[in-house]
């Protein structure tokens, strides 16, 4: 018993789930006049710049009828039965492409493309199945068992009830058994009703079948058994109108077929009961019925033509809004990349300019750089001074008087006399050196016609012609004493001669 309840609950949940999955599946109906559709009192959803069939259907959840007008307008509401009183127009009047998806048509200037909700259309059909099985068993002890099962099937709900009653109060032993299986299946499809007609009208269809059977048997105890089974199945299709027109052939790109199969298993068990009172054997027939329900879902794809034109309920491609979003995203990404590249270029250029060393700013820290003026130059005295003449190493236009002036110096010469002449020249020039400033001086560029030159040596070295010589270190130590004594004597002799010349 508990297993049967579990099976019934499972079937109910599956039916509800499949009903929810089939919700809002629209199918193209036909092209109708715009004035006729407006008379049905549909709700106007407004104009959308990127209108498409799928967008309008999403704007009308749970509505039975959806209509599109002139490429941008959207209407929804009403019922499928209201369309039966309208007259279809030629599909060429619904040739305006959708604004958001030009591969579909969204009505015309004076007509509308109409789509119907499959869930709303199948909700108008109802099928019911009733099955009853009764079994009566009698014997000398008057023990009976009766089983009754009823199954009602609809598109949205399913209910099943089983009533069973039995009575037995004896110890039984199974002697024989027989099993009878009755299978009943009912299926419903989400695309149309169970009855299809092209040009005729149908009000209701009812089919009933019954199969009674009677079985009797007798035993030595004058017991009899009778089994009766009756199965009735009825299905009907109702509508608000007296007649239903099914002249159009619908196209469903994706439809789901639901099949419900119910199996009834009846088992008759023969039991032999022995009473303890009079030791008389009695035979009891017990009937057990098991109900198994199986739900199967099959997905299929069908396609048909309506007035020579192929149509589909929903588009598999991207909607207009999605395409616009992709375009905007690509443009924004490109602009961002260009801005990033420009920023990197400017940053790199500024960094290179900041790392450049300006020699004009740093040359004051390099006073001896070639071509730079001295930070603290020594101003030379005027050339008109009587006690100052700039010596020069070449004969230029600015130093034409230096030759005669420089000739007045008594430069030392190498005479055969040796050291006497050198000391005499030095003593003669000592008195004149005190009249001149320091000769450690770099000549200004103006003296050499703008060409900067530096002194290679000091003036005293030039005047005295002190040349460097290679000296043997071994001979230096031996000649130190003699040179010192000779030098002192020579100095005294030179001093005496100098004094005499001054007189």
Curated annotation (Swiss-Prot):
The modification Phosphoserine is found at residues 455, 458. InterPro entries: Immunoregulatory_rcpt-like (IPR051694), WSC_carb-bd (IPR002889). Residues 1-23 form the signal peptide. Residues 347-503 are cytoplasmic. The chain crosses the membrane at residues 326-346. PROSITE patterns: WSC. Residues 25-118 form the WSC domain. Keywords: Cell membrane, Cell wall biogenesis/degradation, Glycoprotein, Membrane, Phosphoprotein, Signal, Transmembrane, Transmembrane helix. Residues 24-325 are extracellular. GO terms for molecular function: transmembrane signaling receptor activity. It is found in: Cell membrane. N-glycosylated. It comes from Saccharomyces cerevisiae (strain ATCC 204508 / S288c) (Baker's yeast). It is a single-pass membrane protein. GO terms for cellular component: cellular bud; cellular bud neck; cytoplasm; fungal-type vacuole; mating projection tip; plasma membrane; site of polarized growth. Residues 124-260, 470-503 are annotated as: Disordered. It comes from the Eukaryota. GO terms for biological process: fungal-type cell wall organization; response to heat; Rho protein signal transduction. The keyword rRNA-binding does not apply. The modification Phosphothreonine is found at residue 402. This is Cell wall integrity and stress response component 2.
């Amino acid at each position: 018993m508990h297993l049967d309840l579990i099976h019934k609950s499972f079937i109910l949940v599956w039916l509800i789930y499949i009903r929810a999955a089939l919700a809002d599946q629209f199918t193209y109906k036909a092209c109708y006049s715009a004035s006729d559709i407006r008379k049905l009192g549909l709700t106007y959803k407004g104009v959308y710049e990127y209108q498409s069939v799928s967008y309008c259907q999403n704007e009308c959840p749970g509505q039975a009828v959806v209509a599109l007008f002139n490429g941008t307008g959207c209407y929804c509401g009403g019922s499928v039965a209201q369309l039966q009183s309208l007259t279809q127009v030629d599909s060429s009047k619904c040739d305006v492409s959708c604004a958001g998806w030009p591969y579909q048509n969204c009505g015309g200037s004076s007509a509308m493309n109409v789509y119907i909700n499959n869930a709303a259309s199948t909700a108008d059909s109802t099928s019911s199945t009733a099955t009853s099985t009764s079994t009566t068993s009698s014997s000398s002890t008057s023990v009976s068992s009766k089983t009754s099962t009823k199954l009602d099937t609809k598109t949205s709900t399913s209910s099943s009830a089983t009533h069973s009653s039995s009575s037995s109060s004896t110890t039984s032993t199974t002697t024989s058994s027989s099993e009878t299986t009755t299978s009943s299946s009912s299926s419903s499809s989400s695309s149309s009703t169970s009855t299809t007609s092209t040009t005729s009208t149908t009000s209701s269809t009812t089919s009933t079948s019954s199969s009674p059977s009677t079985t009797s048997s007798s035993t030595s105890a004058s017991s009899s058994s009778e089994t009766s089974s009756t199965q009735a199945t009825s299905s009907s299709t109702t509508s608000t109108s007296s007649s239903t027109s099914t002249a159009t052939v619908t196209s469903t790109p994706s439809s789901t077929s639901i099949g419900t199969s119910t199996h009834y298993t009846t088992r008759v068990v023969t039991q032999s009961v022995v009473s303890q009172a009079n030791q008389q054997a009695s035979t009891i027939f017990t009937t057990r019925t098991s109900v198994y329900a199986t739900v199967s879902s099959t997905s299929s794809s069908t396609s048909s033509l309506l007035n020579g034109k192929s149509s589909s309920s929903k588009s598999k491609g991207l909607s207009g809004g999605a395409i616009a979003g992709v375009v905007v995203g690509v443009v924004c990404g490109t602009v961002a990349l260009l801005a990033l590249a420009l920023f990197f270029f400017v940053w790199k250029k500024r960094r290179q300019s900041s790392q450049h060393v300006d020699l004009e700013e740093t040359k004051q820290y390099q006073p001896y750089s070639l071509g730079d003026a001295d930070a603290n130059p020594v101003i030379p005295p005027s050339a008109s001074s009587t006690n100052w003449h700039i010596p020069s190493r070449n004969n230029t236009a600015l130093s034409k008087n230096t030759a005669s002036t420089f000739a007045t110096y008594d430069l030392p010469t190498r005479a055969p006399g040796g050291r006497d002449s050198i000391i005499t020249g030095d003593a003669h020039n000592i008195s004149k050196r005190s009249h001149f400033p320091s000769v450690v001086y770099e000549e200004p560029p103006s003296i050499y016609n703008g060409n900067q030159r530096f002194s290679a040596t000091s003036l005293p070295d030039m005047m005295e012609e002190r040349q460097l010589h290679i000296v043997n270190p071994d001979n230096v130590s031996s000649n130190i004493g003699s040179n010192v004594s000779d030098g002192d004597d020579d100095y005294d002799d030179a001093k005496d001669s100098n004094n005499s010349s001054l007189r």
